[in-house]
Amino acid sequence: MPINDQFPSGLRILVVDDDTSCLFILEKMLLRLMYQVTICSQADVALTILRERKDSFDLVLSDVHMPGMNGYNLLQQVGLLEMDLPVIMMSVDGRTTTVMTGINHGACDYLIKPIRPEELKNIWQHVVRRKCVMKKELRSSQALEDNKNSGSLETVVVSVSECSEESLMKCRNKKKKKKRSVDRDDNEDDLLLDPGNSKKSRVVWSIELHQQFVNAVNKLGIDKAVPKRILELMNVPGLSRENVASHLQKFRLYLKRLSGEASQSNDSESTKRYENIQALVSSGQLHPQTLAALFGQPIDNHHSASFGVWIPNDNLGRSQNEHFSVDVSSASNRPVSVAVHGLSSSANFRQRGDVNNNRIRQGYGSNVNEESWILERSSRQR
């Protein structure tokens, strides 16, 4: 949806909730705000709608606890399909652990029922925020492409104001075409030859198989993990070295993308991302060695360690940098609290500088040990 004088009127929202009463109430409140609303009572049906109408929605508002496919699974599928859609979770469950799980899975916000109209009035901010991220990615890709064609080392800066909606869509389609091409090459590597049949069988990376892979990488260390040793530790019949090599490459690119998002964001966004990473470490979902490789810092397996990241501070014209320090321990299991709508709490993170703990309004954390990273290979057969 283009941002014009009428924005946010006409914002296209998909609402998913198995509670029909709550669903109709939300629809009425959103219609009063001049939003275009599509309602759905089942998460799997909502996923089908998103696949068939990829460019028909600007935002998804989903309940957490639903029969069949829950809100977390829907959130993961939206991320795997690379729809670039902000997803807001909502639930009557306001426990810190539940909220943190939603944020770690990639939710940009978490609303606690009953939801007030004031909270729905400003959800358009997440759409604007996501478009700004897309513009930054487009600016970076255009600069790299221009440098490659000209052979010059000069950095080409493209003004954000010059990035029109049409150019954004072209860049988006170009990225999807490249991804499909890479996926086809990877699928060819993942096929196993059957001597008795001319057809090839496909290796599907299920949640359990991916978890074995992650455990093997954590045991070896992300820097020392090679396909041959990972294959020996996994000991899965029918799995080849080429399959593991392809999956390891995707896993490293995923960690690199997390590191890149954290280094390119501003102070507030960086603080939120490192809070999410701290939550993953505290809950045991992210291995310390993997985290160390992500930021290029060594970590002792037998002692608590800390890593520091310099975050540029451009606010208020200050030229100094602020240092953000997070404690990491493989045996740590300290609770992490998050401020959300209607819920007061304090953040248990040790920070240096003037970084404030604001309410988490946007989450970029991902659970590397769970199904949030697993590629849905079956969707590419369509």
UniProtKB/Swiss-Prot annotation:
Residues 171-193 are annotated as: Disordered. Predominantly expressed in young leaf tissue. Keywords: Activator, Cytokinin signaling pathway, DNA-binding, Nucleus, Phosphoprotein, Transcription, Transcription regulation, Two-component regulatory system. GO terms for cellular component: nucleus. It is found in: Nucleus. Its main location: nucleus. PROSITE patterns: HTH_MYB, RESPONSE_REGULATORY. One of its GO terms (biological process) is cytokinin-activated signaling pathway. A motif (Nuclear localization signal) lies at residues 199-202. GO terms for molecular function: DNA binding; DNA-binding transcription factor activity; identical protein binding; phosphorelay response regulator activity. Two-component system major event consists of a His-to-Asp phosphorelay between a sensor histidine kinase (HK) and a response regulator (RR). In plants, the His-to-Asp phosphorelay involves an additional intermediate named Histidine-containing phosphotransfer protein (HPt). This multistep phosphorelay consists of a His-Asp-His-Asp sequential transfer of a phosphate group between first a His and an Asp of the HK protein, followed by the transfer to a conserved His of the HPt protein and finally the transfer to an Asp in the receiver domain of the RR protein. Residues 171-181 have a biased composition (Basic residues). Residues 12-128 form the Response regulatory domain. The modification 4-aspartylphosphate is found at D63. It comes from the Eukaryota. InterPro entries: ARR-like (IPR045279), CheY-like_superfamily (IPR011006), Homeodomain-like_sf (IPR009057), Myb_dom (IPR017930), Myb_dom_plants (IPR006447), Response_reg_B-typ_pln (IPR017053), SANT/Myb (IPR001005), Sig_transdc_resp-reg_receiver (IPR001789). Residues 202-252 bind DNA. Binds the target DNA as a monomer. Transcriptional activator that binds specifically to the DNA sequence 5'-[AG]GATT-3'. Functions as a response regulator involved in His-to-Asp phosphorelay signal transduction system. Phosphorylation of the Asp residue in the receiver domain activates the ability of the protein to promote the transcription of target genes. Could directly activate some type-A response regulators in response to cytokinins. NCBIfam families: myb_SHAQKYF. Belongs to the ARR family. Type-B subfamily. This is Two-component response regulator ARR14. The gene is ARR14.
